[in-house]
Amino acid sequence: LPSVGAGSVLKDMIRSGRMPVVRLENVFRQAEVSPIVRNAHKINRGQMPEFLAGADSEFALEEFANEQDAAEFVARTYAQLTSGGDWRRVQVLTPMHKNPCGVQNLNKLLQKYLNPPSANKLEVNIPGNVLRVGDKVMQIRNNYEKDVFNGDIGRVIKIDGKNVTVAFPERPEGDYVTYAQGEVEELQLAYAMSVHKSQGSEYPYVILLMVQSHYIMLQRNLLYTAVTRAKEKVLIVGSKNAVRTAVENDKTKRRYSLLAERLQESSEVF
């Protein structure tokens, strides 16, 4: 996907012909005969994916005319799928941050279903929301001092006054990270995240929101990126028309940087 900031650095580096490039052709994330792989290839070719019957199938679609109804369905489904306590099994992805099916509203809704407030549950404020013990959170800035980085996913295990302690699964057992009052803003709820934020990650089960109000982001490369994050199952919630819009839209916004041309002018081969 294009970078959130200016330019298109990696694409320009490849286009310049001055950088060594390796193309990965073998799929290891999903089984070779997985419907996810088959549909990813179809999406890449500009064809509609084939949806299997039943929300629990390997590649399914649940349609809703009302976007808030779609968001509520996602929250209920997420709660059912993680009722056994495996909070890392499911990840909700969505193209945008705003609207009923955006990251912000979905995280508030999912928190209400999964980790509601109670009289004996401590919480601490973060921009636009609160954190409670048990919440799934994401580090949103690189913090070299704490050895945690943008995109790391963890779970709040303790709140002591204004301090928040988070367990990150990739760290050794007991090697927790504590955030003081001024550092808590480095965290945000992570029940739902943007497709951009999910790049490079994988999850057993992906629930993807695809609705028409996100039309500005409905592009083929975004849909392809989202469904290929899943190892076992994909559930798309929203509108088949939104999926079709994304499949048929292979035009990415042109970015003018001259980086490729500058690299081509260089006599050095990297």
Enumerate the language-model features and the residues they cover:
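Conserved helicase motor core of P-loop NTPases
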Residues: L1-K146, I157
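Conserved flavin/dinucleotide-binding core of flavoenzymes
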Residues: F149
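C-terminal accessory regions
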Residues: D152-F270
